[in-house]
Amino acid sequence: MKRQNVDLHKLIAQQKDKMKNKPKTVTFGIIGAGRIGKLHADNLLSRVEGARLKAITDPFLDEEWAASRNIPVTGKDHRIMLDDPEIDAILIGSPSAEHAPQLIECAQAGKHIFCEKPIALDPIIIRNALAEVDKSGIKLQVGFNRRFDPNFSAVQQQVASGALGDPHIIRITSRDPAPPPAEYVAGSGGMFLDMTIHDFDMARFLSGGEVTEVHAYGAVLVDPEIGKAGDIDTAVISLKFANGALGIIENSRKAVYGYDQRVEVFGSKGTALADNNTPTSMVILNESGTIRDKPLYFFLERYEKAFVAEMQAFVDAVRNDEPTPVSGNDGLAPVLIALAAQQSLKRGKPEKVESI
């Protein structure tokens, strides 16, 4: 048999090219180890391809929890991660008031950033933070996880593909299973900035257009303590979009049957809708009628897949040097809509978003 000559130098060069072109693993540090920080940590440790979690910090870090996850670096001060050359990206999951200052610090340190919503409640603060992001050239993704829900994403794809024709009406139903404590409400920024902000983002996502006008109606029908804290617990909000579509958002802080999350887009060629997720798809039919499971009760289980998918999308954007799917402007726009809704509720008339 005739032996083939192998050019070892050429083979080594080819292997080097393959390694050079292979996307690198993205090494993370997390700021904040509360409920959402721990959720993201567990996802990065085992459910997100191409990611590595090196560090997590929190002033009140549960060291026993961190040790159980074998996270190499832990601490109370997030600044220990900013000077670490191994850390490529920082996930900001701290209290909302700390998001913008930490975002600026991370951008100035040259770290890619995944920031939970909201960046801030003040548009000026958000714009200043985004200016630092633009200056640094890093990638930023804002944590509007519901865009990555498989059902909601499928509806959006129907709109984007033109299968529904021109969108005419977007309807979003978002009801919590139980109201938050009044002390939480007092520091939340209000229902529109705390709860409905997800729905304002979803309205933009589904319609493919910007919201131009808001008319908000609100009431205290669930818990009088929420009213005493200066907020509402029930709302209906009508929207106008730049592309001519109309929208309706229904909110309640308490749905006795569970976490009610539904969307519908009606267009010139048809309708697409996504119903609630339930623990099982079983349906019982008997002489009493039809019985099916209640919706999933808690947001962490309802949006379990969405939390993983949004982080995978961020990691893929960093690895492949592509734009993130939820930009800094996507973080700003829902805040402007929420503030317009607050103004509308206060004044009792429609409010232009551009006036904010």
Region spans (language model):
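N-terminal Rossmann-like dinucleotide-binding module
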Residues: K2-R69
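NAD(P)-dinucleotide binding in Rossmann-like oxidoreductases
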Residues: T27, V220, E225-K228, A242-A309, ...
